[in-house]
Amino acid sequence: MKLNNLSPAPGSKHAEKRVGRGIGSGLGKTGGRGHKGQKSRSGGSVKPGFEGGQMPLQRRLPKYGFTSAKSLVSEEVRLAELAKVDGEIVDLESLKKANVLKDNTQYAKVILSGELNKAVTVRGLKVTKGARDAIAAAGGKVED
């Protein structure tokens, strides 16, 4: 055994450094905070984005864009998720019941992602071209 091979026992914890407990600790007096200044004081920190009184970047740049209200109540449904619905008919209500869609969702679109192994009838949902073909290939149909 040599000094360079020593290591702590597995599972052991290292005691954390106690700040401000004398010179010998290596973190005495100023406790790693340097001398004076705002950041050395207790509670002394600047809020995120503050640039010393200069107009912050976030306020210098213009606002743009908006969040469409329709996007908040719209969701995409993967093809594989249609199999989670109990029964043959898949519509907005049955998808909500199967916990595929949120309760406040008003519009949904079936997209081609994953595989569909059972025949289902999709009713009242938008369906992409690829998903429409996949539903038909699985023996199901789409009613608009």
UniProtKB/Swiss-Prot annotation:
Keywords, sorted A to Z: Ribonucleoprotein, Ribosomal protein, RNA-binding, rRNA-binding
Instruction: Name the source organism.
Output: Chromohalobacter salexigens (strain ATCC BAA-138 / DSM 3043 / CIP 106854 / NCIMB 13768 / 1H11)
- What is the annotated quaternary arrangement, including any partners? Part of the 50S ribosomal subunit.
Q: Which GO terms describe its molecular function?
A: rRNA binding; structural constituent of ribosome
Record keywords: Ribonucleoprotein included? yes
User: What is the primary gene name for this protein?
Assistant: rplO
**UniProt record, GO biological process:** translation
Which spans of this chain does the record mark as coiled coil? none
Indicate whether Transcription regulation appears among the record's keywords: no
Record-linked PROSITE patterns:
RIBOSOMAL_L15
Gene3D superfamilies cross-referenced by the UniProt entry:
3.100.10.10
Compositionally biased spans, kind Gly residues: 21-31
Q: What does this protein do?
A: Binds to the 23S rRNA.
Its domain of life reads Bacteria
The cross-references to InterPro entries, in alphabetical order and at most eight, read: Ribosomal_uL15 (IPR030878), Ribosomal_uL15/eL18 (IPR021131), Ribosomal_uL15/eL18_sf (IPR036227), Ribosomal_uL15_bac-type (IPR005749), Ribosomal_uL15_CS (IPR001196)
The name of this protein is: Large ribosomal subunit protein uL15
A GO cellular-component term linked to this record: cytosolic large ribosomal subunit
For region Disordered, the annotated ranges are: 1-58
Q: Which family does it belong to?
A: Belongs to the universal ribosomal protein uL15 family.
